[in-house]
Curated annotation (Swiss-Prot):
GO BP annotations, alphabetical order: RNA processing
Residue sites binding ATP per the record: Q100, H297, L298, A299, D300, Q301
Family the entry assigns: Belongs to the RNA 3'-terminal cyclase family. Type 1 subfamily.
Predominant location category: cytoplasm
Annotated protein name in UniProt: RNA 3'-terminal phosphate cyclase
Role according to the record: Catalyzes the conversion of 3'-phosphate to a 2',3'-cyclic phosphodiester at the end of RNA. The mechanism of action of the enzyme occurs in 3 steps: (A) adenylation of the enzyme by ATP; (B) transfer of adenylate to an RNA-N3'P to produce RNA-N3'PP5'A; (C) and attack of the adjacent 2'-hydroxyl on the 3'-phosphorus in the diester linkage to produce the cyclic end product. The biological role of this enzyme is unknown but it is likely to function in some aspects of cellular RNA processing.
Keyword ATP-binding: yes
Annotated source species: Methanosarcina mazei (strain ATCC BAA-159 / DSM 3647 / Goe1 / Go1 / JCM 11833 / OCM 88) (Methanosarcina frisia)
Active site as annotated: H322 (tele-amp-histidine intermediate)
InterPro entries referenced in this protein's UniProt entry, alphabetically: RNA3'-term_phos_cycl_insert, RNA3'_phos_cyclase_dom, RNA3'_phos_cyclase_dom_sf, RNA3'_term_phos_cyc, RNA3'_term_phos_cyc_type_1, RNA3'_term_phos_cycl-like_CS, RNA3'P_cycl/enolpyr_Trfase_a/b, RPTC_insert
């Protein structure tokens, strides 16, 4: 049995999710203690419980400590099983964080896994559904990962009610080295518009979606226009789709991406739409100007997949505590050792 100190490093829910996912992959029983010990409300929260319940169901695990506020968790997996699963997280619990708890295990199923999940698609402190679809899953495809998500209905805090369907196929993972594209880092010797015909649109265009539910149509339009204006000032083209809907919950947000760098922001009462768009755009510009292969959020998500795939690497502008913690957890389960070195003002993370 592997024992994990849940207060190590970043000490949050991600540590538990990664530990459970790798327990499912390796078949190792785990005991996680001191869960979220240093947080204002320690122990497991409601949204953690749904993710852990789902993981237990998919791999037939014996579990104890699955209650709100619990500081210890025992998880003993049996076999990862495919099939169809319907999950209702309740209110606005994050759909993407639930998926984060099970996705590393799904390449090893015997048959495909089909999920229908209700909860929050665009909520604070978690990747948005658009980021998962257009950045995370696109990056995982480079390892041979076979998964897709389809947005049915957006769910915002506090009511949630969003709906997503997801399909994951058995697959064999292989290593991949993420390299920055020349369009990521702009210098005087590489101004916008120079190079091969068509290169500007291919290398420089940022894609995005600005959305709102039960709000005036000008809200997502203003978010998009604010982001687009900032990108133009910075020398980037941007194509941002705008959608206005009437879903169960009320809210707005914007997600922007280029390659393996993304950024997002959520609207809230009293926050002008222009500030929402600007916040997301600033995040993307910061990542692109750093010239790294992946953004700081994708970096920590890639860690367990790199270890499972072998012989992989990326560069990132900053090694966050989330990423360092994920490396530590992953090394507890798998016979791998990550290497980290500073290179040209960036951090290069490699394994295998």
């Amino acid at each position: 049995m592997i024992e994990i100190d849940g207060s190590y490093g970043e000490g949050g829910g991600q540590l538990v999710r990664t530990a459970v996912a790798l327990s499912a992959v390796t078949g190792e029983e785990i005991k996680v203690t001191n869960i979220r010990e240093n947080r204002p409300n320690p122990g497991l929260k409601q949204q953690h419980l749904k993710a852990l319940e789902t993981a237990a169901k998919i791999c037939g695990a014996r579990v104890s400590g699955l209650s709100q506020g619990s500081s210890e968790l025992f998880f003993a997996p049996v076999e990862i099983k495919g099939g169809k699963y319907n999950i209702d997280i309740g209110t606005a619990g994050s759909i993407t964080l639930l998926l984060q708890c099970i996705m590393p295990a799904l390449p090893f199923v015997e048959e495909k896994v089909e999920l229908t999940i209700r909860g929050g698609t665009d909520v604070a402190w978690s990747p948005t559904i658009d980021y998962l679809k257009h950045v995370t899953l696109r990056a995982l495809e480079q390892f041979g990962y076979a998964g897709s998500v389809t947005l049915k209905e957006r769910g915002y805090y506090p009511r949630g009610g969003g709906s997503v369907s997801a399909v994951f196929e058995p697959c064999k993972l292989h290593g991949f080295h993420f390299r920055k594209t020349e369009g990521n880092k702009k210098t005087e010797s590489n101004p916008v518009g120079e190079g091969l015909k068509g290169e500007k649109s291919m290398m420089e265009e940022i894609i995005g979606v600005s959305h709102a539910s039960n709000l005036p149509a000008h809200v997502p339009a203003r978010q998009a226009e604010s982001a687009r204006s900032l990108f133009l000032e910075a020398g980037y083209d941007a194509r941002i789709d705008v959608s206005s809907s009437e879903f169960f919950s009320t809210g707005s947000g914007i997600t922007l991406w280029k390659g393996y760098c993304g950024g997002s922001a959520l609207g809230k009462k009293g926050l002008p739409a222009e500030k929402v768009g600007r916040q997301a755009a600033e995040e993307v510009i910061k990542e692109l100007r750093a010239g790294a292969a992946v953004d700081i959020h994708l970096a920590d998500q890639l860690i367990p997949y790199m270890a499972l795939a072998g012989n992989s690497s990326f560069t990132v502008r900053e090694l966050t505590l989330h990423a360092a913690t994920n490396i530590w957890v992953t090394e507890q389960f798998l016979d791998v050792k990550f290497k980290i070195k500073e290179k040209e003002g960036l951090f290069e993370v490699s394994v295998g």
